[in-house]
């Protein structure tokens, strides 16, 4: 995946694959604990990509979502991005990622954009579009929908 990212994005970014590879560069295991699989960064952006073969709801939600937020590198300044890439993305995984992104932005007082992708969508957006813009659009649309809903609801304040 790192080579494909480089082929699509070029020299604009620095790439740091953290997964374990053999001498030919073929991955054979995930990244060690408390670190994401692939980190991509430049002066004003930090992008964490977690790649997994896990497809089940319980495993995705429990093993591949909230951990991403712990893996985000707070030492890099600028806007942060996160992608979860799997053969299948469960709808609960997508919802949890959206909500946790908003909570994380509020807690850390910094911009964070995220989106889970199935493998074919991730390949297509990298090849034909702008993954960064796609993550931004997805996050801002969710924020807008949430804001619209909250503005319409008149709950008693206590």
Give residue spans per PLM region:
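Catalytic core segments in nucleotide and nucleic-acid processing enzymes
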Residues: 1-158
């Amino acid at each position: 995946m790192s080579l494909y990212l480089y082929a699509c994005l070029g020299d604009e970014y620095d790439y740091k694959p953290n997964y374990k590879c053999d001498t030919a560069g073929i991955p054979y295991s995930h990244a060690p604990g408390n670190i994401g699989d692939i980190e991509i960064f430049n002066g004003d952006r930090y992008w964490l990509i977690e790649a997994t073969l896990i497809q089940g709801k319980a495993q995705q939600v429990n093993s591949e979502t909230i951990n991403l937020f712990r893996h985000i590198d707070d030492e890099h300044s600028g806007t942060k991005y996160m992608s979860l890439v799997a053969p299948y993305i469960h709808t609960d995984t997508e919802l949890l990622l959206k909500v946790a992104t908003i909570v994380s932005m509020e807690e850390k007082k910094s911009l964070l954009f995220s989106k889970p992708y199935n493998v074919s969508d991730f390949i297509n957006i990298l090849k034909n579009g702008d993954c960064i813009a796609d993550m931004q659009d997805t996050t801002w649309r969710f924020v807008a929908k949430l804001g619209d809903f909250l503005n319409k609801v008149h709950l008693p304040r206590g």
